[in-house]
Regions:
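Conserved pre-ATP/AMP-binding loop-to-beta segment of ANL
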Residues: 23-26, 145-146, 153-174, 180-181, ...
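Conserved AMP-binding/adenylate-forming core of the ANL superfamily
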Residues: 24-82, 98-109, 158-163, 184-191
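AMP-binding/adenylate-forming catalytic core of the ANL superfamily
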Residues: 120, 257, 264, 403, ...
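Gly/Ser/Thr-rich phosphate-binding loop
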Residues: 261-265, 277-365, 379, 387-389
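Conserved ATP-binding/catalytic segment of the ANL
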Residues: 369-379, 386-394, 398-459, 610
Length: 698
């Protein structure tokens, strides 16, 4: 491991040094998702692949040009990212659209238009679908593809190491901004090194640690915390794809157990998912006693999620003191504050009514989880957003951060950069847009100044959702739709309020409008609104200048003062009464799987998966169960494109008729008591990371 006197100035220098000093040591292990073997890369292997991709890039691009990365999570993604760093090309992490539908392509098209990449790095399998997108791009932005899986490793000899300095931009992280107006955070090589130092210190990473990750590589937490941190610190890393985890959450815990994972984590929903989905029969064969840093971030941390997880997995020897809270955002590279290893996450009970008025008083009603302390060489303030006054302890204000991890603004967006990255007292401060307070140096996050919604760790922007409703539901008045966060049964979800004209109210049933709104949002974002309010004309709260007041809309909905004439879930979505036809065995079998996963009593042929309460996590689990039970090749994309029971069953029937078998699932090897690791096993632990989300609560 490198000490303070050996710190590299770039991640390129870090990997090159390891490739020279310990070339055969395992750098990464990717777990196989079928009956094939996983992929392991030594430092020599990764360096060779990075140099070959860099050489190919240098033949087509100049220092500072951009390259978009479009891969599933896996070895190609990693090699391509380092290839960009090696070439001095600015990497733009992204992900292939979930389907060919317009909604799923919009974000990628917006990123391409904003970043103006010289190349798109991908694999041969994705070449044709990506080339079809050129019809939606201008000639200047037409995709030029480089399939990295077809490169000859010998081209690495042509690599010419560029003069990359710490202030040069390493990559653009598109994690903030709406679909229509994306904002690419400019993260420099120096930012990366500074933040990796913080993560190593904060987590207390040592030579005996093993990092296990399922987080997406296109997301800052998965990329910087899951992939780059183990390479920077020289510790083993085990990676699996997010899909592999979501299909069966127990796989995450099995990997920690099998490979001796000590550092791993994810958003709050990952812990809830394990509590809900892992069978009791699995608890005794999983050993989580070595898991020392179970970090939680990327969305609000809920005490009940942690308590349920700790209670259930006590049988697997999980220690609740391993929970570790972290807060951060892409504009600060990733990590801003964190707890203390082995100390758990302190909770603070406060008066709910006082908190709603941004005051802190101990009492009942709300429980806030401590997000740790600021890190060395970095500073934090709580500031009154209106006056700019710095606030003392127990005063709620906007969280500001400063230090060498703070990014270099937004790509070619001076206006947004000036609003978010401000000068004060001779240094640059990041206005996070999050609300919180300090108590004895510890940070508590209470909410957001921004209107952004965070659902299952993913950022959803209200402007995007509002545009979707307005374009797909003509009866909703243009400019009179508001999307906002709601909390139902302890989980954050989407709320929609839409003004409906008097004439439409008379001619179109309220239930039909509600169903149309929920279906439009569900198909675009794989998450149906938990609340829909149909409003009378003029009822939507606005400022004197005509701007939507989304927070006021939510508050009025909560206190009952919103002028609505129909409300979901006061109205329930209409479901057809008849069950699937008895003579259609396939429809019935798939219907039973839907009912079990969605927790509904019945499902009809034309019922829509996402309107029944499904989301992207449930979709992954349904696809996996159908694939395994019927032995058919099936992909998540096929449920997104055919979201009704009837349409999805027809898709499955076509796959069966074509005789496309599923890849055989990985054989499960029974394990008894876990044995101590030998020296060879410890070397084997040189492993990896993987898989989704953005700005607010990393």
């Amino acid at each position: 491991m490198m000490d303070a006197f050996e710190l590299p100035t770039t991640l390129v220098q870090a990997l090159r040094r390891r490739a020279v000093q310990e070339p055969e040591r395992l750098a990464l292990r990717f777990l196989a998702e079928d009956d094939g073997e996983g992929v392991v890369l030594s430092y020599r292997d990764l360096d060779l692949r990075a140099r070959s991709i860099a050489a190919a890039l240098q033949a087509h691009a100049q220092l500072g040009d951009r390259a978009v990365l479009l891969f599933p999570s896996g070895p190609d993604y990693v090699a391509a990212f380092f290839g960009c760093l090696y070439a001095g090309v600015i990497a733009v992490p992204a992900y292939p659209p979930e389907s060919a539908r317009r909604h799923h392509q919009e974000r990628l098209l917006s990123i391409i238009a904003d970043a103006e990449p010289r190349l798109v790095l991908t694999t041969a399998d994705l070449r044709e679908p990506l080339l079809q997108m050129n019809a939606q791009l201008s000639a200047a932005n037409a995709l030029q593809l480089l399939c990295v899986d077809q490169l000859d490793p010998a081209v690495a000899e042509a690599w010419d190491e560029p003069q990359v300095r710490p202030e040069h931009i390493a990559f653009l992280q598109y994690t903030s901004g709406s679909t229509a107006l994306p904002k690419g955070v400019q993260v420099s090589h120096g930012n990366l090194v500074a933040n990796e130092v913080l993560i190593r210190r904060g987590f207390g990473i040592g030579a005996d640690d093993v990092i296990v990750s399922w987080l997406p590589l296109y997301h800052d937490m998965g990329l910087i915390g899951g992939l780059l941190q183990p390479i920077f610190s020289g510790v083993p890393c085990v990676l699996m794809s997010p899909r592999y985890f979501l299909e069966r959450p127990v796989r995450w815990l099995e990997a920690i157990s099998q490979y001796g994972g000590t550092v791993s984590g994810g958003p709050d929903f990952a812990y809830r998912l394990c509590s809900e989905r892992v069978a009791e029969s699995a608890l005794q064969r999983i050993d989580l006693s070595g898991w020392r840093v179970a970090f939680s971030g990327s969305e609000p941390i809920r005490q009940d999620s942690l308590e349920r997880f700790a209670e259930k997995f006590a049988a697997s020897r999980f220690d609740a003191s391993s929970f570790f809270a972290c807060y951060g955002l892409a504009e600060a590279t990733l990590f801003v504050t964190g707890g203390q290893r082995g100390q758990g996450i302190p909770a603070l009970a406060v008066d709910g009514e006082a908190l709603a008025r941004n005051r802190i008083a101990e009492g009942e009603g709300s429980v806030l989880m401590c997000c740790g302390r600021r890190q060395p060489e970095h500073a934090g303030l709580i500031v009154d957003a209106a006056s700019g006054e710095v606030l003392g302890d127990d005063n709620v204000g906007e969280i500001w951060a400063a230090g060498p991890s703070i990014a270099h603004g937004y790509w070619r967006n001076l206006e947004a950069s000036a609003k978010t990255f401000v000068e004060r007292d001779g240094r640059t401060w990041l206005r996070t847009g999050d609300l919180g307070f300090l108590r004895d140096g510890e940070l508590f996050v209470t909410g957001r100044l921004k209107d952004m919604l965070i659902v299952r760790g993913h950022n959803l922007y209200p402007q995007d959702i509002e545009r979707t409703v307005e374009s797909e539901v003509p009866s909703a008045r243009k400019g009179r739709v508001a999307a906002f966060a709601v909390t139902v049964d302890g989980e954050e979800g989407i709320g929609i309020a839409a003004e409906i004209g008097r004439g439409v109210q008379k001619s179109v049933p309220a239930q039909e409008l509600i169903d149309s709104i929920r279906q439009a949002v569900a198909e675009a974002y794989q998450e149906a609104p938990k609340v829909v309010a149909l409003l009378n004309p003029g009822a939507l709260p606005k400022t004197s200048s005509g701007k939507l007041q989304r927070s006021a809309c939510r508050l009025r909905l909560e206190d009952g003062s919103l002028d609505s004439y129909a409300l979901f879930p006061g109205l329930q979505a209409v479901q057809e009464a008849q069950p699937p036809a008895g003579d259609d065995e396939l429809l019935a079998r798939i219907g039973e799987i839907w009912k079990a996963r969605l927790g509904v009593a019945q499902v009809a042929p034309r019922d829509h998966f996402f309107l029944l309460g499904g989301n992207s996590i449930g979709a992954a689990q349904v696809v996996a169960q159908v694939r395994d039970s019927l032995g058919v090749a099936l992909d998540l994309r096929q449920l997104f494109e055919a979201p009704t029971l009837q349409a999805f069953s027809a898709t499955v029937a076509r796959q069966l008729a074509a005789g496309l078998p599923a890849e055989a699932p990985m054989a499960h090897l029974p394990r008894g008591v876990d044995l101590p690791q030998s020296a060879a096993q410890q070397r084997l632990w040189l492993t990896w990371q993987i898989d989704p989300q953005s700005a607010a609560y990393n």
